Regions:
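Hydrophobic helical h-region of N-terminal Sec-dependent signal peptides
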Residues: 7-16
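Bacterial N-terminal signal peptides that target proteins for export
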Residues: 1-7
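N-terminal secretory/targeting leader peptides
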Residues: 11-12, 23-112, 121-327
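Sec/Tat signal peptide C-region and signal peptidase I cleavage site
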Residues: 16-22
Length: 327
């Protein structure tokens, strides 16, 4: 009996010691857990905990529980939050050169998006993010093209968008793009968008199919147009000061988990986007394509690109990226 008690005590001591050593990391994101953000975050959590053999635990906070994307970015920069999963456009106020990834029609396919966020180009963006924004890019979420929704009318030609109040993130490039097309863009924080649409403060917004469906925008939007102007890329970021406090082993685990989760999320996107599109149609959303997208492209290239070359590192730098993508 005495031996049994000693063994039990030893086991409990070991378990308690292990629990005490486990470190918990918080991940904040704006979308629901059943979104593509949720898919990436859940896979990242599984991988971190698996690779660390439970010594690193991850807690997820979906649906804007920890604030807007802008506030979560700021919290990661100062070390108040461990990870934030955010739209790359919301990082550009801190690291303007990342705006190259949001230039209209810079990325034109899934293949472009993958090439832009792996290998040497991925290293380039991470160096910029660390230097300018004070965050380390852990992973990338491929969320597909940002398609335009609105409550007023079908948009099939440039003239149809004139005057529509379109929500955009806090991103000067996106504001300028919609203004060049004749719309009336309004910068609005992500948690406010559904209410803004519901109350008519804004007429529309743009996001990929999975986001549009999981956010239930079909309840307040009647029309969707497949405008291929911007591929939505959303990185998981960690503050540099937090990242540098980790051991070499912990950093390796986080980076490996991030890359593997990124590949998982790409497959998730490819299989789930078509389901979300069909579901929105079933909910009564009228889906259209542009009859004159070449004109949208021309305006973007001639009026928007030149205005932002300096902000994103110069025309030569942007053209190098385009060349790397085969454009």
């Amino acid at each position: 009996m005495f031996k049994k008690t000693l063994v039990t005590s030893a086991v409990l001591t070991t378990l308690l010691a292990h629990a005490a050593q486990a470190e918990t990391f918080r991940v904040g994101m704006g979308d629901p857990i059943d979104s593509d953000q949720g898919a990436l975050a859940q896979r990242f959590k599984e991988l971190v905990e698996q690779l660390s053999e439970g010594e690193m635990q991850v807690e997820l906070f979906p649906g804007g529980q920890l604030g807007s994307e802008t506030s979560m970015i700021q919290d990661t920069r100062i070390g108040k939050l461990d990870f934030a999963l955010v739209g790359v456009g919301n990082l550009t106020p801190y690291a303007a050169r990342l705006g190259a990834l949001t230039m209209p029609y810079a990325i034109r396919s899934h293949a472009d998006a993958v090439k832009a966020t792996t290998g040497t180009l991925a290293d380039r963006w991470n160096a910029i993010a660390e230097e300018e924004a004070g965050v380390h890019i852990v992973s990338w979420l491929y969320s597909n093209f940002r398609y335009l929704t609105n409550s007023q009318r079908p948009v099939t030609a440039l003239e149809d968008i004139e005057g529509l109040k379109i929500r955009v993130p806090q991103n000067e490039l996106m504001l300028a793009t919609y203004e060049a097309w004749g719309a009336s863009p309004i910068s609005m924080s992500w948690p406010e968008v559904f209410t803004g649409l519901q109350q008519g403060v804004i007429d529309g917004q743009d996001n990929p199919y999975i986001v549009n469906y999981t956010m239930k925008f079909h309840e307040v939007q009647d029309y969707l147009t497949e405008v291929h102007y911007q591929y939505s890329l959303q990185p998981i970021v960690m503050g540099v000061r937090t990242y540098e406090k980790l051991s070499d082993e912990e950093r390796a685990i986080i980076d490996r988990a991030g890359l593997e989760a990124q590949l998982y999320a790409l497959q998730f996107q490819l299989t789930e986007a078509s389901k979300a599109r069909a579901a929105m149609e079933e909910e009564g959303v009228e889906i259209a394509t542009l009859e004159d997208e070449e004109e949208w492209i021309r305006i973007a290239k001639e009026e928007v690109w030149p205005e932002f070359y300096d902000a994103i590192g110069g025309q030569e730098s942007f053209e190098e990226m385009q060349k790397a993508l085969g454009h």
